UniProtKB/Swiss-Prot annotation:
Sequence positions bearing S-(dipyrrolylmethanemethyl)cysteine: 241
Entry's cofactor comment: Binds 1 dipyrromethane group covalently.
Any GO BP: protoporphyrinogen IX biosynthetic process
Keyword Lipoprotein: no
Native source species: Citrifermentans bemidjiense (strain ATCC BAA-1014 / DSM 16622 / JCM 12645 / Bem) (Geobacter bemidjiensis)
Name of the featured protein: Porphobilinogen deaminase
Length: 318
């Protein structure tokens, strides 16, 4: 049965609305008779802007309230930045589509100065412990300044906070038309992306076949396999915003190459690895690499990181 209406739930940030409106536009092009509406929902991650995400604690900081609206039957689908999506879902809900990936790399915005040329002790604004750890690993002299807010707000902090550079996801900058502000793209061997970075995920009630049929065209098989491998690694490591974990999957033909990274927040201790195998075994490859990283020092790193989190108690996977 063809759907007459589809209700999209989204955060209200500039980037989230761009993403949700893109999904809305694609649906309207494909189904001219369908009425597609947006519902803006404020998440806890949007409400708490004066504290680093690592200190807020918990998972799903940018999705929980949206999922609750779906469970109440107020929306049919949710559009998320994949890097915000936890590896576990409320009963009945799930990730049904992962869109083709935008540029997954991190970007430097500065006053025209490339990363390698930043002065000794340069102040770098970032919202991610993952970036902080990787950049400190190669430049321990840098001063990392945690910045929060939407893309424009974080870009503005280059001036308002007296920063030498800010590091942001290239995908968001490209989507919002800020590509001309980028000084340099960081190669993935220097700054491995966040899990799912650059891809969008569409979540729905998995029992609603009509909705699943309507949105299935959004799924990119190659991006989906790459991101599912990354997410399997994260799931095995039980990571969230509080831990510097990064992974990047690349599909070529029927093969998948997955690179993973776990580090201490200061970047002084880290472990990195690579696995390759059939792309159809994406989740098995993610777990395999996670177990390799954990056995080669990742377990001790995570134990140390979690030990410092007085607000959380968890068992570190062995």
């Amino acid at each position: 049965m063809a759907l007459k209406e589809l209700r999209i739930g989204t955060r209200a940030s500039q980037l989230a609305l761009w993403q949700a409106n893109w999904v809305k536009s694609e649906l309207e092009k494909r189904y001219p008779d369908m009425t597609v509406t947006l519902t803006k929902i404020k998440t806890i991650g949007d409400k708490i802007l004066d504290v680093p995400l690592a200190q807020v604690g918990g998972k799903g900081l940018f999705v929980k309230e949206i999922e609750e609206a779906m469970l109440r039957g107020e929306i049919d689908i949710a559009v998320h930045s994949m890097k915000d999506v936890p590896t576990e879902f409320p009963e009945g809900l799930g990730l049904y589509c992962i869109t083709e990936r935008e540029d997954p790399r991190d970007a430097v915005i500065s006053n025209g100065v490339k990363f390698a040329d930043l002065p000794q002790g340069a102040r770098i604004g970032t919202s991610a412990l993952r970036r902080q750890a990787q950049l400190l690993k190669v430049r321990p002299d840098l001063e990392m300044v945690i910045i929060r807010g939407n893309v424009q707000t974080r870009m503005d902090k280059l001036k308002t906070e007296g920063l030498d550079a800010v590091i942001l996801a290239a995908a968001g900058l490209n989507r919002l038309g800020f590509a001309d502000q980028i000084t340099e793209m960081l190669p993935t061997d220097l700054s491995l992306p966040a899990i799912g970075q650059g891809a969008l995920g569409i979540e729905c009630n998995l029992s609603n076949q009509d909705v699943k049929d309507a949105i299935s065209f959004f799924n990119s098989p190659d991006t989906s396999r790459a991101v599912r491998a990354e997410r399997a690694l994260l799931w095995r490591c039980e990571g969230g915003c509080q831990v510097p974990i990064a992974a990047f999957g690349e599909v070529t033909g029927d093969q998948l190459k997955l690179t993973g990274f776990i580090a201490s927040v200061d970047g002084k201790v880290s472990v990195k690895g690579v696995v390759t195998g059939p792309a159809d075994d994406c989740e098995k490859l993610g777990v395999k690499l996670a177990e390799q990283l954990l056995s080669e020092g990742g377990h001790a790193i995570l134990a140390e990181v979690y030990q410092r989190e007085v607000s959380r108690e968890k068992e570190i996977p062995v």
